Amino acid sequence: MARWQRKASVSSPCGRSIYRFLSLLFTLVTSVNSVSLPQSENPAFPGTLICDKDEVRIEFSSRFDMEKWNPSVVDTLGSEILNCTYALDLERFVLKFPYETCTIKVVGGYQVNIRVGDTTTDVRYKDDMYHFFCPAIQAETHEISEIVVCRRDLISFSFPQLFSRLADENQNVSEMGWIVKIGNGTRAHILPLKDAIVQGFNLLIDSQKVTLHVPANATGIVHYVQESSYLYTVQLELLFSTTGQKIVFSSHAICAPDLSVACNATHMTLTIPEFPGKLESVDFGQWSIPEDQWHANGIDKEATNGLRLNFRKSLLKTKPSEKCPFYQFYLSSLKLTFYFQGNMLSTVIDPECHCESPVSIDELCAQDGFMDFEVYSHQTKPALNLDTLLVGNSSCQPIFKVQSVGLARFHIPLNGCGTRQKFEGDKVIYENEIHALWENPPSNIVFRNSEFRMTVRCYYIRDSMLLNAHVKGHPSPEAFVKPGPLVLVLQTYPDQSYQRPYRKDEYPLVRYLRQPIYMEVKVLSRNDPNIKLVLDDCWATSSEDPASAPQWQIVMDGCEYELDNYRTTFHPAGSSAAHSGHYQRFDVKTFAFVSEARGLSSLIYFHCSALICNQVSLDSPLCSVTCPASLRSKREANKEDTMTVSLPGPILLLSDVSSSKGVDPSSSEITKDIIAKDIASKTLGAVAALVGSAVILGFICYLYKKRTIRFNH
């Protein structure tokens, strides 16, 4: 209700520099809400003074004669304040004025002086001055930081404690003026603290902080799920209100406590569900990597059905784990920063791979009697030195080794390179051992643990028998190529920008002479950049049938019709179209449909024939378009190659703009009226033809009857 705005400058005794707000927005709002103050000097004041946040408001009794007593704001001497602008509402008996120009600032607040004088007499009484005091509660701005802890079932928000009295053990927080607000706008869920506690919320206050626990399934929290990945967003406001002050703790958070993690021999893949936020950067260790530098730093992304981040295993750490017999890859304190609803929001997770096994026992041995496997240098930390790889106690070497990517591939015989054989149940198991040294051992002392060892295994089913045979196959059949379904559409647009076509329910459209009609033919459901849409002919008819007569040519053989005085103009699709070759845009002037200076009186229907061409190798003579048409003869079109499309509805042409001046040409009233006239004229013609036919038949019957009478006589 404030009409004037008052700004307060606040500085701390310590002379601290300007505070800055972090991702947590904290606002401390002070107000004195409808507090009726005692009148220290004259208890007979005929009204109630209210000290609001930005102004002073005096509400007089309805029995008070405002015009007679004329209340006014004055200084301590009773003189009117020159620059004070106050509002006096005679109907509602209310006087309002701002603090800045109508009060006197004193220690701790503002002095208010009101004079009430009888305007019907010149006699002044000494008790017509009233003095009041409005307290000023200063606002404080604090440099603060929030702590958000995300779990799958709970979010914990911690805010700094501002007033020690809130931590008073004698205070019953459930009865204080606390309100919890989850969400934003009209969909926000607002709860008094007492109701919130019943629904699983919890508020903890100590001398250092205020902590609110919010259940993850609370109304107002938005959840996003994809496969086994979970992410949710929450916008929180925690409000504390008491006499004369209002504190608002505000936070906006993204939580991803349970993202899907999958690991293979080369990468860790992190799956983030699709939601309106955009991932801007990732932080781990000492690195903060923006999106445009991910690939260069070993992070690749897949943005289909959500977002998948692939971290090279060389970026990961390893640790011993009680649940893993060997070691485990992980990323510590991975910080994901998103741009979401105008804010930069971060969440921290600790993704881990499943246990790494040094033994591979589930692979079938190759049919040629060999065992195939791969070794990566980053399978351990420190990395392996691939030049020191050995197979068992032999000198067998990998068949393929690339140091740049840290890969070595082996193809070792089952009867060589130290491969051992044993029987387990119905399986014949072959195993060998790979060992290598680390590139940078942790110390200069060499222990057995300084050498990397990995057991590799494969198996055959015990009753399997190896057979060698040569099978001669038939030659592969030749591919049969047949064009797929071709789907085209013809549309009209309001202007040359080609932003939004007219809908089907907007037809028939109304156009005047000299107005261009912007049309577009495009290919639907095709994303092949090698195909191109080529126009053959475009024409207009007075009925829906494309083959009806008369016909007015617009485009012939892919070019403007040369016999038109006002020729068709083609427009390029431009960079806004995903595949510009899938579009043909042009406009036609309505002069093309005027004969002997008279406009058409019926609806006009437009049609086009077109075909799809292969830009790599032109597969039809119709694909070769050379304009103008006078440079070549009329092309012979194969009807099987082309497809004819029509506008969704007709266009109504008006020959004279002045005849409908001041009327919207797209008005449905004009359209209905002219269509009605067109239908009426056609109906009248049909009735006239029917009457004429009846007269002729009657005349023939009359002649036949007369002839019969003469013949009988």
UniProtKB/Swiss-Prot annotation:
<dbReference type="GO" id="GO:0005576">
    <property type="term" value="C:extracellular region"/>
</dbReference>
<keyword id="KW-1015">Disulfide bond</keyword>
<dbReference type="Pfam" id="PF00100">
    <property type="entry name" value="Zona_pellucida"/>
</dbReference>
<feature type="glycosylation site" description="N-linked (GlcNAc...) asparagine">
    <location>
        <position position="217"/>
    </location>
</feature>
<dbReference type="Pfam" id="PF23736">
    <property type="entry name" value="Ig_ZP2"/>
</dbReference>
<keyword id="KW-0325">Glycoprotein</keyword>
<dbReference type="InterPro" id="IPR055356">
    <property type="entry name" value="ZP-N"/>
</dbReference>
<feature type="propeptide" description="Removed in mature form">
    <location>
        <begin position="634"/>
        <end position="713"/>
    </location>
</feature>
<feature type="region of interest" description="Disordered">
    <location>
        <begin position="462"/>
        <end position="484"/>
    </location>
</feature>
<comment type="function">
    <text>Component of the zona pellucida, an extracellular matrix surrounding oocytes which mediates sperm binding, induction of the acrosome reaction and prevents post-fertilization polyspermy. The zona pellucida is composed of 3 to 4 glycoproteins, ZP1, ZP2, ZP3, and ZP4. ZP2 may act as a secondary sperm receptor.</text>
</comment>
<dbReference type="GO" id="GO:0005783">
    <property type="term" value="C:endoplasmic reticulum"/>
</dbReference>
<feature type="site" description="Cleavage">
    <location>
        <begin position="633"/>
        <end position="634"/>
    </location>
</feature>
<feature type="disulfide bond">
    <location>
        <begin position="559"/>
        <end position="627"/>
    </location>
</feature>
<dbReference type="Pfam" id="PF23344">
    <property type="entry name" value="ZP-N"/>
</dbReference>
<keyword id="KW-0272">Extracellular matrix</keyword>
<feature type="glycosylation site" description="O-linked (GalNAc...) threonine">
    <location>
        <position position="455"/>
    </location>
</feature>
<dbReference type="InterPro" id="IPR042235">
    <property type="entry name" value="ZP-C_dom"/>
</dbReference>
<comment type="subunit">
    <text>Can form homopolymers that assemble into long fibers (in vitro). Polymers of ZP2 and ZP3 organized into long filaments cross-linked by ZP1 homodimers. Interacts with ZP3.</text>
</comment>
<keyword id="KW-0278">Fertilization</keyword>
<feature type="domain" description="ZP">
    <location>
        <begin position="364"/>
        <end position="630"/>
    </location>
</feature>
<feature type="disulfide bond">
    <location>
        <begin position="396"/>
        <end position="417"/>
    </location>
</feature>
<keyword id="KW-0732">Signal</keyword>
<dbReference type="GO" id="GO:0062023">
    <property type="term" value="C:collagen-containing extracellular matrix"/>
</dbReference>
<feature type="glycosylation site" description="N-linked (GlcNAc...) asparagine">
    <location>
        <position position="184"/>
    </location>
</feature>
<dbReference type="InterPro" id="IPR017977">
    <property type="entry name" value="ZP_dom_CS"/>
</dbReference>
<keyword id="KW-0964">Secreted</keyword>
<dbReference type="GO" id="GO:0032190">
    <property type="term" value="F:acrosin binding"/>
</dbReference>
<feature type="glycosylation site" description="N-linked (GlcNAc...) asparagine">
    <location>
        <position position="83"/>
    </location>
</feature>
<feature type="disulfide bond">
    <location>
        <begin position="365"/>
        <end position="458"/>
    </location>
</feature>
<dbReference type="Pfam" id="PF23740">
    <property type="entry name" value="Ig_ZP2_3rd"/>
</dbReference>
<feature type="glycosylation site" description="N-linked (GlcNAc...) asparagine">
    <location>
        <position position="172"/>
    </location>
</feature>
<feature type="site" description="Cleavage; by ASTL">
    <location>
        <begin position="167"/>
        <end position="168"/>
    </location>
</feature>
<dbReference type="GO" id="GO:0035804">
    <property type="term" value="F:structural constituent of egg coat"/>
</dbReference>
<keyword id="KW-1003">Cell membrane</keyword>
<dbReference type="GO" id="GO:0035805">
    <property type="term" value="C:egg coat"/>
</dbReference>
<feature type="glycosylation site" description="N-linked (GlcNAc...) asparagine">
    <location>
        <position position="393"/>
    </location>
</feature>
<dbReference type="InterPro" id="IPR055355">
    <property type="entry name" value="ZP-C"/>
</dbReference>
<feature type="disulfide bond">
    <location>
        <begin position="51"/>
        <end position="134"/>
    </location>
</feature>
<keyword id="KW-0165">Cleavage on pair of basic residues</keyword>
<dbReference type="GO" id="GO:0005771">
    <property type="term" value="C:multivesicular body"/>
</dbReference>
<keyword id="KW-0812">Transmembrane</keyword>
<feature type="glycosylation site" description="N-linked (GlcNAc...) asparagine">
    <location>
        <position position="264"/>
    </location>
</feature>
